[in-house]
Amino acid sequence: MSDYSSLILRYWYSNQPSRWLLTPLSGLFQLAVKIRQWAYTQGLFHTHILPLPVLVIGNLTLGGTGKTPLVIWLAQFLRQHGYRPGLISRGYGGHAQNYPQQVYPDSDPHLVGDEAVLLARRTGCPLVVGPDRVAASHALLAHSDCNVLLSDDGLQHYALGRDIEILVVDGVRRFGNAHCLPAGPLREPLSRLRTVDLVVTNGMPQGGEFAMYSQLQDARHIKDGTLRPLKKFRRTKLHGVAGIGNPERFFSQLRALELTIQPHPFPDHYGFQSEDLAFADQQPVLMTEKDAVKCIRFARDNYWYVPMDVSLPASFGAQVLSLLQQAAKKKLNIETTG
């Protein structure tokens, strides 16, 4: 992670007196956000309503909160309950010339984005990426038989109508200094919390929030998929590599398992090259699963990645199913009366 990025994070997530210098700009940003929201609610900007229930999973802050693991959990959960979920995503980190793009487990992450390839591999669901969420959703419906749509991110993309909004919160960093950009990390004011359907906290929740706990799984060799329990790395010095929104979370989880790591943080969606991981020694390299999809093309024998699974309370799943049933009935009534 660059010194500039680290400086910005310290500024946003600590009580820096100098933040007041940017407060007027944050006020203008917040005003623009409210005007835009008002324009959508008044019909000045068009919201596209899809014929199937739409769940949007997003956050209020810049940076990683754990959306992708939750999307994976939701896709697997819904399939277990008889649904056929389809996914759309922005495709961050991808550089395709044309969008929308369908994503498959063997797609090139440099074209469609690292998170998209990870989602395709972990869920097995049809997936389309593109900056235009509406166009991506129509492309998904044209090439799949999904009966529920999950939008990875897109909470602020009001052009796409949604039936359920799930907000993900970092349980440690929360909302930083609670200021909107650029004085703070917020994309929208904290009042937005009152309008979402469910709040999931990655870590310790507060009142009314559902706890999501993550657990690192056995390491997998990046070349052949060989499994190795993480405890087998305890007597070895390791390189920890993370190009995610909050690299320190990954490093802290490794340290909590009594692993000795030299951390190597990189920006989110970083386009890894072989020289980035050309360390002087031959000690094992442990990276996130998201980073592994980009590093496999130049992988060495000492490269391992660490999958992560999350757990949520049964009450959260029950709430999701209840909201989905309500959304489906509402759409059926609209079709019947229309």
Swiss-Prot record:
Task: Tell me the route in metabolism or biology where this protein functions.
Answer: Glycolipid biosynthesis; lipid IV(A) biosynthesis; lipid IV(A) from (3R)-3-hydroxytetradecanoyl-[acyl-carrier-protein] and UDP-N-acetyl-alpha-D-glucosamine: step 6/6
Please report the name of this protein according to its UniProt entry. Answer: Tetraacyldisaccharide 4'-kinase
Q: What protein family is recorded?
A: Belongs to the LpxK family.
Q: Reaction catalysed? A: a lipid A disaccharide + ATP = a lipid IVA + ADP + H(+)
Task of the protein: Transfers the gamma-phosphate of ATP to the 4'-position of a tetraacyldisaccharide 1-phosphate intermediate (termed DS-1-P) to form tetraacyldisaccharide 1,4'-bis-phosphate (lipid IVA).
Which of UniProt's keywords are assigned here? ATP-binding, Kinase, Lipid A biosynthesis, Lipid biosynthesis, Lipid metabolism, Nucleotide-binding, Transferase
| GO terms of molecular function | ATP binding; tetraacyldisaccharide 4'-kinase activity
Any single GO CC term annotated in Swiss-Prot or TrEMBL for this entry? plasma membrane
EC category: transferase
Binding-site residues for ATP, renumbered to this chain:
T61, L62, G63, G64, T65, G66, K67, T68
Query: A GO BP term, please?
Result: lipid A biosynthetic process
Q: Which residues form a coiled coil?
A: none
User: What are the cysteine partners in each disulfide bond?
Assistant: none
Protein's organism: Nitrosococcus oceani (strain ATCC 19707 / BCRC 17464 / JCM 30415 / NCIMB 11848 / C-107)
Query: Which Enzyme Commission number(s) are listed?
Result: 2.7.1.130
